[in-house]
Amino acid sequence: MEELLEILNDIKDELNGNVKLVFQPAEEGIGGALPMIEDGILENPHVDAAFALHVEPLEKTGNIQIKDGSIMASPDDFKIVVHGVGGHASAPEKCVNPVTIGTAIITEFEKLNATVLKDKPCVMTVCYFNGGTCNNAIPQTAEIMGTARSLDNETREMLIELLDKTAHETAKKHG
């Protein structure tokens, strides 16, 4: 970015208009572009055109990709806590195993990826699953965490609703 600043400074007399270089902090957390836009980053002076840059570690060094419209998806992290009835592994009939329910939820999510979501501008990935701390006790809870990413608000809302509905319906089926 420093090199770009130097180049732009060298040709500033040839430029028609103003140039703003904006750095987007914490784009995958509470930061990102929206709070900056709401705070007026695109005004004073007004921005007529914007170009974005995002590092792509899988792209060969020296190559760039150019695309009109959205190219990087917005992330929505999710965490699901499955509540069961814990107990000793010798008496599973007295328990509701949250690990079993959690694996069923993850399986249903993968089915969504392969069917409903396969042609949509989104992706949903389970990245964490944890239930229990030993090999002879059924735990009280299990946790599932992941990320749902989408390129537009309509798809984002559909994806969040679908994940919530699928998790609740699957849990209900299993006790």
Q: How does the language model describe each region?
A:
Residues 2-4, 8, 13-139:
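Histidine/acidic-residue-rich, glycine-tolerant segments that coordinate divalent metal ions
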Residues 97-100, 158, 162:
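A general alpha-helical scaffold signature found inside nucleotide-binding enzyme cores
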Residues 127-130, 159-164:
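A general structural motif
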Residues 140, 174-175:
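Flexible hinge/switch segments at interdomain interfaces of large molecular machines
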Residues 164-174:
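A common structural junction motif
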